[in-house]
Amino acid sequence: MSGEHTVHEIVTNFLLDTCRLRPLLSRHAVQAAGWCAELATDHPGDDAEADFIPLTTGSVAEFYIEPMLPHVGDVDVMTYRSTELAIPRGHPPPTQLPAEFSEYVKVHEIVDSDFPGYVYLVLRYLLTECTDDGTCRYRCFAYDTGNKQYLSVSTRPAANTQSIHGPALLTINTFFLSLDHVPCVRCLSWPPQAADWPTRHRNYRWPDSATVGRVVSNGCDVVHVAHRQCRQDEWESKLQWRLSFSRA
């Protein structure tokens, strides 16, 4: 028991010493913020009204080990469009959305594939913003379910400094940390595919119930990447997505 208690203390001290938010702004945090600002000022080529909403994830966001450079080689930034949203299949569309979403939002249902964690996104609703008694809400219009429209992404490097890295588009930079840019679709609900995670048995009572509740309330994201058995398939490679819990 004493040995187990010692291990518990070592793990706890490591997490407390390395996984808190940085108390001071570092050069790497500034570079991450710079990448976020650059992505946020861009607009999708097929939708000038849409905004990219950035979120820094990965080691730069999670650790404050200094110096950071030996441990981190790039900045991971996820971006989702302000005009797109994913919801679990069978869930009703939301009537209210966070302020960063646009006046119109396309809502895609998350449909399971044959591989756990990998899904398809099927266009289901169009939400349009309206004001009722001073309250901003969204009116819902349903698409024809007889003609399924699958959301697809064809990610191609835009320059010699870019390459595909899993679900990310890797941008090499010789002066700053390189950028791993992961386009995604925001899901405000916790997906039923991970329904057992909040009640899963946890050693050492970590994460605690408050942290679990906070993670679940943040929902998840859906990133464009196909299962390894489907990446050579012309259809599946473009239409298959994967659930991501990086914002946790």
PLM region spans:
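Non-catalytic helical "accessory" subdomain of NTase-fold nucleotidyltransferases
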Residues: 1-248
